């Protein structure tokens, strides 16, 4: 761990974004940990309000909102908070807790990329998959500076809300809050051309964790599991480079955020075959009981039961995913929360599985 800190500090001058105190907030915690089944809401930009019917579900304890930065702040300094206001008010009145999953990266507003170095890649998964978009370099100080300004506005408006329990760390990201970057062979060549190194990527994340620790002292800060690019410090392709980069980023989050750190895997399914199943599941389960841990299903079981582990049987797919994400580790600890997409939570036929899942968190 010490070796990683030394390497990271050596590249911090690349991120001249002002100085922040290094906050290891282990002495004070938010009143309650995130806990239970959580519904994932995907913002629909074409609609003026969120559809919050799902908050009435008795098996759901929390709400995770996925929303793009450019849909909140299309004009610099003029954020539209209406949907976030709506969600927090409804969550408070229905006794639910909230996680913000705000996506910069590909989904940053155009003004935030002016003057920033970008590379064009196809979106690698999710809505818009395959669409060519500009991605700001994860360590670009212009881009990160704008993102940090937005986070400050976010914290000033919602940082004291009792309903807001988790904020997802993002910034050196691409398509979601997971720390994943495009990594096909031809994309690796682009990263080499723009000077990607593990140290630059780790240093960007270290700065991000410091900002979140300072701006959100009343919340847990989640990190959705990803990995580094398989490029080493010499900017050469190295199939072993990604794993230590991932470990270093998790280590920095643990060091800076302390007990307010929540490690999350957002690729959970019910596939038993380790060649198809989610590789991050055992890693996160290993942290159960030491820090807050959680899982998010990779997709809806109703819409894609085959990929979720039971072709043609959404109920079984959801049950298998729940069992996988809530299995105790060797010390007997389970994860704190499990996130399920709105389509599955609204479906009548899935209610027995939701009841079953909720019972595991009591």
Enumerate the language-model features and the residues they cover.
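N-terminal secretory signal peptides that target proteins for export/translocation
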Residues: 1-4
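Sequence-pattern detector for short linear motifs
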Residues: 6-8, 301
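Bacterial N-terminal signal peptides
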Residues: 9-21
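Boundary at the C-terminal end of the N-terminal hydrophobic targeting segment
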Residues: 24-26
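Aromatic-lined carbohydrate-binding surfaces of glycoside hydrolases
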Residues: 31-196, 212, 217-241, 246, ...
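Substrate-binding cleft of secreted/luminal carbohydrate-active enzymes
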Residues: 99, 103, 256-362
